[in-house]
């Protein structure tokens, strides 16, 4: 059973930390912290994908990219191994940051360990909650971030990234991906990735 006060305080602290993101995104004419928006969107998707999401899953969804801007991509080589090193460092950082907040607000070690496992994507393919978090993450990427990369990436690279994204998704997640409202260009690239 969710302790509403403790949960609300944990979410407030996670949101406060993500609200410090210097990168901004315009939403309805208002500049908002990018990581805060991303975390909220992932949480919203988790709630759509899972009828009764656990407290741990909701905490992981909100904190799985906690203060991502603190470890920029350009600190690592622009290679596939460099990308993987960066992602591994990010996951550990996010898990540590989230665990610190959860400990401060009084969560048990059992809950903290579970949230860390979800953030670190431990055995996520065999874990329904891990799959839901991955689906939510992928759906938010497709829905809100893909368009921004189109001018940066070559078409072949974009299709390759989309293929990898789709391979990570469950059948339910793929069903939702097919119903996203995307630009014509994004929809065409997604279609190419599926074929």
Segments from the language model and where they lie:
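His-Asp-centered metal-binding catalytic motifs of divalent-metal-dependent phosphohydrolases/nucleases
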Residues: 55-76, 98, 117-123, 137
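Generic, well-ordered alpha-helical segments
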Residues: 34, 38, 49-58, 86, ...
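Solvent-exposed, flexible loop/coil residues
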Residues: 70, 75, 80, 146, ...
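Divalent metal-dependent phosphate-bond-processing catalytic cores, especially two-metal-ion Mg2+/Mn2+ enzymes
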Residues: 2-5, 9, 16, 29-36, ...
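Short glycine/proline- and acidic residue-enriched helix-loop micro-motifs
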Residues: 25-26
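Helix-adjacent hinge/juxtasegments
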Residues: 74-117
């Amino acid at each position: 059973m969710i302790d509403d006060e403790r949960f609300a305080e944990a979410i407030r602290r996670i949101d406060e930390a993500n609200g410090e993101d210097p990168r901004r995104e315009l939403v309805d004419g208002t500049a908002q912290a990018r990581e805060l928006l991303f975390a909220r969107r992932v949480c919203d998707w988790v709630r759509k994908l899972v009828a009764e999401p656990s407290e741990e899953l909701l905490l992981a969804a909100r904190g799985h990219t906690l203060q991502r801007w603190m470890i920029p991509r350009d600190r690592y080589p622009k290679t596939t191994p460099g990308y993987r090193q960066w992602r591994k460092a990010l996951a550990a950082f996010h898990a540590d940051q989230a665990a610190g907040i959860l400990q401060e607000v009084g969560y048990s070690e059992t809950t903290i360990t579970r949230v860390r496992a979800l953030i670190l994507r431990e055995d996520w393919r065999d874990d329904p909650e891990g799959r839901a978090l991955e689906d939510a993450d992928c759906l938010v990427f497709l829905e809100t971030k893909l368009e921004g990369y189109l001018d940066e990436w070559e078409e072949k690279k974009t299709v390759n990234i989309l293929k990898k994204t789709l391979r990570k998704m469950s059948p339910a997640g793929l069903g939702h991906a097919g119903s996203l409202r995307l630009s014509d260009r994004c929809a065409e690239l997604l279609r190419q990735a599926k074929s």
